[in-house]
Amino acid sequence: VFIEFCVEDSKDVNVNFEKSKLTFSCLGGSDNFKHLNEIDLFNNIDPNESKHKRTDRSILCCLRKGESGQAWPRLTKERAKLNWLSVDFNNWKDWEDDSDEDMSNFDRFSEMMNNMGGDDDVDLPEVDGADDDSPDSDDEKMPDLE
């Protein structure tokens, strides 16, 4: 289970994994606003196998389920809709596809996050018409409005 706390410029990050609870706290932003979240999880996790990683824009947590292959219908024990919690469907994975590769993906995921900036050594392919001398359809005169 992946959880991302979107806090820019976080300091004093503390993530505590317990068997059925996750506690997160930090100071964030230029005003050092104190963030605190305590989540009673739907089911148990393995605190020793769960990890977190701080980036400039967020804190990424990877929770290892206590029993692999067991579906969680939601993240929290309570059924109430929490306004601060949303699903990232770009990273959605059906529980039926759950496998042991999940934690190894966390290492690759954090590596990907570290490499999201530009890389000056990357050779980009040539794009036809991308040079400054080529005529552009935006340069054509617009018809008068009637």
Curated annotation (Swiss-Prot):
Record key words, sorted: Cytoplasm, Fatty acid biosynthesis, Fatty acid metabolism, Isomerase, Lipid biosynthesis, Lipid metabolism, Prostaglandin biosynthesis, Prostaglandin metabolism
Pfam families documented for this protein: CS
Domain of life the protein comes from: Eukaryota
TM region positions: none
UniProt catalytic activity: prostaglandin H2 = prostaglandin E2
Pathway(s) per entry: Lipid metabolism; prostaglandin biosynthesis
InterPro entries documented for this protein: CS_dom, HSP20-like_chaperone, p23-like
Function: Molecular chaperone.
Name of the molecule in the record: Prostaglandin E synthase 3
Provenance organism: Gallus gallus
